[in-house]
Amino acid sequence: MTNAAFLLLLTLTACVAPCPADAVGFEHLTPAKAAAEALRHRNKSKSKAFEDRFHPTYPSVCNVKKCAAREASACLRGAVMYQIFTRMFTPEGTFKAAERKLPELKELGVDIIYLTPHQLADDDQDPRFWSARQRKCGFGNPKNPYRQKDFYAVDPEYGSAQDLKDFVIAAHRLGMKVMFDLVYFHCGPKASFLTEHPDFIVRNPDGSPLLGEWAFPEMDISRREVRDYLYANMEGFVRDYDADGFRCDVADMLPVDFWEEGYLRCKALKPDFFMMCEGLKGDDQRLAFDLSYGFYTQWTMVELLKGAQPASVLRTAWEAQQRDYPKGFHWMRCFENHDFANVNPGEKRKEELYGHDLNAAMIATIFLLDGVPMLYNGQEIADASPQSIFSNRDHGGWHVDWTKADEPYALERRNLVKRLASIRHGNPDLFDAPVIWLETGAADRVYAFRRDLPGQPLTLAVNISAEPAAIRLEGTDVTVPPKSFVIRRGPNLQIDRKERKQ
C-alpha cells in the first residue's frame, strides 16, 4: 500500500466512533512508564470482594460513556472460534498433525481457528529471562512461545513455513478462517534484530534491557523504526500466509494507536480482516479491534465452577461490562484457554476437578451469551489431560488425549458442541442481540437469561448446585438438573445437555 493510500484510509476511518478525550491517558508516555502507570491503575482498588475485580485493567484516553465501538467484521456474526495450542494439540505438536484434524473441527461447527504463536521462540537458558511460571513448572524448557527470538521466522518445532501456509490453505478450503497470535510487547533476550538494532528495546540507564512484567525485554514502541518493523511483520502474515486476523497478546500494554495503524494497514490488504484484543481498555474497539477478551465473565465462570461464588455473580459481571465499556463493545467468551488451562505437574484440570456436567453448562453459557464463543484444545471431548505452555514432545510430552475421544462422556460433549454451534450458526443475532437476565427465585444457585431473536426466543437456565433446582421461569415451572442446564426454545420446547426433549 502506498503512503498516500494509507493516509487516505486513515482519514476516512479517523471519525469512526468519535471519542472526546478525557484528562486520563498514557499515550504520551514511554512504553515503560505507560506500563508502570497502567499497573498502578490496575491495582489501585484492591478488595476482598470478588466483584471489585470488575473494572478496566487500563485507563482509557476517551470517555467511555460518550464513545462507541466501531462495527465488527461481519464474519464474526454467528461464528464459533477454536484455539489450537499447537505443541499440545496433538502428540506430534506440528502443523501437519493439526492440519489432519481440521475436518473434525469443521464438522464440529468451528468457523475461526485461533493459532497460538508459531514464531521462533527464544531458547536462552538464563533463568533471569524466564517468567515465574516458566521456572515453576519444572519442565526446563527455555522455549516459551510468548518469548520470541524472531518475529518473522517459523519455529521448526511446529514445522516449516510451507507447513504453516499449507495449514492455512487447508483451513480455507474447509471454509474456516485462521487467526495468528502476535506478541509485540516484549521479545527474547537473544532476539535476532538486537545485533543490528540494539535500540529496538527499552534499556535501563546502564544499558541493560528493561525487563517487563514477565522478565522479558520490552520493545520500544515509541520508536518509529520499531513500529515499521512490526507493521511489516503484520502485513507479511496477511500477504504471504493469508492470515485472516490477529489475536494480540497483552495488547493494552502497547499504545492503542500502534494497533490502530496496524489494523488499517492489514485491512487495506484484506477487507474482511479482523483483530482480537487480550485486554480491557475502553479505547480498544474505537478502531483497532473487533473483539476483546470477556475477562469479567471468564473469571466469574471459573469461580462458579469452583463453587466459590453465587450464581448471580455472572449477571453482575455481565452488567459491569456494559457499564465500563463503550456502546457496541464485543467480547470473546471462554472460560478455558492456554493461560487458564495451564497447570503444573500433579495439578488437575477443570474437567476433572469440577466434573463434565458443570463444564458443559459453562460451554452452553458462552455459546448463548453475546459475542463470540471460543473453545480450547480438546474441550469438545471433555479432555482432562494436563496442559502447560512449556510442555511439548521433548519436555513432559503432554498433549490432548485423543484416545478417549470415543468415550461416552466425550461423545456426549461433542454432540452438545455440535448442537450449540448449530444454534449459533442459525441465529447470528446472538452476536449482539440484547441479553435479558431473568429472575429465578434461586439466585444463589441458578442464573438464567433470554435472547430475543427473530422467530422464537432462546432461554438458558444454569444450576450450579449439586441438587435439582425447581424454578419459576417466566411463568413456567422448570426443573434444572444438578450442575447442569436447560435451554428453552419458545414456550414449550426444552432441551438439556443430552438433548432430552420435554
Model feature map: region roles:
Residues A5-A14:
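Bacterial N-terminal signal peptides
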Residues F26-A32, A36-K65, R239, D249-W331, ...:
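Active-site-proximal helices and loops of the catalytic beta/alpha 8
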Residues K66-K96, L102-D111, P117-Y241, E261-L269, ...:
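Substrate-binding/active-site clefts of carbohydrate-active enzymes
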Residues A72, L76, D123, Y325-A470, ...:
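Loop/helix patches that line or flank the sugar-binding groove of alpha-linked glycan CAZymes
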Residues A79-Q83, I112, G175-M179, A243-R247, ...:
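Structural preference for beta-strand elements that scaffold enzyme active sites
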Residues I84, L105, L115, F151, ...:
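Conserved, mostly hydrophobic/aromatic
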Residues Y114-D123, D181-K190, D249-P255, E278-G282, ...:
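Short, solvent-exposed turn/loop segments enriched in Gly/Ser/Thr/Pro and often Arg
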Residues I464-Q502:
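C-terminal beta-sandwich/jelly-roll accessory domains of carbohydrate-active enzymes
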